[in-house]
Swiss-Prot record:
Top enzyme class: transferase
Annotated source species: Streptococcus pneumoniae (strain JJA)
Gene3D superfamilies: Vaccinia Virus protein VP39
Gene: prmA
GO molecular function: protein-lysine N-methyltransferase activity
Main location: cytoplasm
Cellular localization per UniProt: Cytoplasm
E.C. number: 2.1.1.-
Protein name, as recorded: Ribosomal protein L11 methyltransferase
Catalytic activity: L-lysyl-[protein] + 3 S-adenosyl-L-methionine = N(6),N(6),N(6)-trimethyl-L-lysyl-[protein] + 3 S-adenosyl-L-homocysteine + 3 H(+)
Length: 316
């Protein structure tokens, strides 16, 4: 019987997606997130606060590796990669532990964390192996969270989806920068975008996004490619969305302003509280006007507009 190794990493909440992505890059065959907030239940209202539930500062990222992988090497590589990123984000003191699992335990363990989750008014994320019957008007995003990049329920992803729901009316061209799982591209298509171009620097993300897109019917309007932010891109867009680290976001703002059409939108997420002012100032210096600012915990998401009429935007 094949055995698997379970590697658990305890990290500050804001490091969830970063550590998950690093573990996948280091060969994990699946990633699960243990979070105290997962037990409050799924609701169909965005941004609901549950004061009776204590939000712990740390979450646990669990990665699964076949027994042919030397997890001590994975641990060392992870520590080295994290140390390179300490200037961008305080992840706290990493706690790492490993456990051996039988194959049937692996199959059950990582799947038990994932159930259908209503993310916004219209959008519900459903694991690929789950049979789910949509209600009237409900739009379903099928994801395989075992591939990489979590389930799409992280606050930065939730707020990005909410922002897309806010700005898309049908017929738009969308650029999805740092696509990861492809969830924002899939959502854009479901919300009526005519054409979506998804980019990621990571070859794993490009493959995973394509595989997730193929789980959802009618997604032929999504085009996935390797790319370094918006460098070399010449496609004009109605909406540009990016859910990546704040220190990386500021490097795409000028290209975003060049590519977004007049009256178009730039959605940025993945911004921790301490970096918000930096991102806002960079976007406004480029010529964008802030239309919507959302906050959930330590995370910020913003919708900027390229417009000459600022009467309807924040501060206008």
């Amino acid at each position: 019987m094949e055995t698997w190794q379970e590697l658990k990493v305890t990290v500050k909440r804001e490091g969830e997606e970063l550590v998950s992505n690093l573990l996948i890059e280091l060969g994990a065959q699946g990633v699960a997130i243990e979070d105290s907030l997962d037990y409050v239940g799924n609701v169909d209202r965005f941004g609901e606060i549950f004061p009776e539930v204590e939000q712990q500062e740390e979450i646990v990222v669990t990665a699964y590796y076949p027994d042919t992988v030397d997890v001590t090497v994975v641990e060392a590589d992870l520590q080295a990669r994290i140390s390179e990123l300490t200037d961008f984000m305080d992840l706290g003191e990493l706690k790492i532990g490993t456990t051996a699992l039988a194959e049937e335990d692996w199959a059950d363990n990582w799947k038990k964390y994932y159930e259908p989750a209503r993310i916004t008014h219209d959008l519900t994320i459903v694991p690929s192996w789950t049979d789910y019957e949509a209600t009237a008007g409900e739009k379903i995003i099928k994801l395989d969270p075992g591939m990489a990049f979590g389930t799409g329920t992280h606050p930065t992803t939730k707020m990005s989806l909410f922002a897309l729901e806010q700005v898309l009316r049908g017929g738009e061209t969308v650029l999805d920068v740092g696509t990861g799982s492809g969830v924002l591209s899939i959502a854009s298509s479901l919300l009526g975008a005519k054409e979506i171009f998804a980019y990621d620097l990571d070859d794993v993300a490009v493959r995973v996004a394509q595989e997730n897109i193929e789980l959802n019917p009618g997604m032929e309007n999504i085009h996935v490619a390797a790319g370094d932010l918006l460098k070399g891109v010449e496609i004009e867009a109605d909406v540009i969305v990016a859910n990546i680290l704040a220190d990386i976001l500021i490097h795409l703002i000028d290209d975003a302003y060049r590519l977004v059409k007049d009256e178009g939108y730039l959605i940025m997420s993945g911004i921790i509280k301490d970096k918000w002012d930096m991102v806002r100032e960079s976007a406004e210096s480029a010529g964008f006007f802030l239309e919507t600012h959302m906050v959930q915990g330590e995370w910020n998401t913003c919708v900027f507009k390229k417009t000459k009429d600022i009467s309807g935007v924040i501060g206008g």
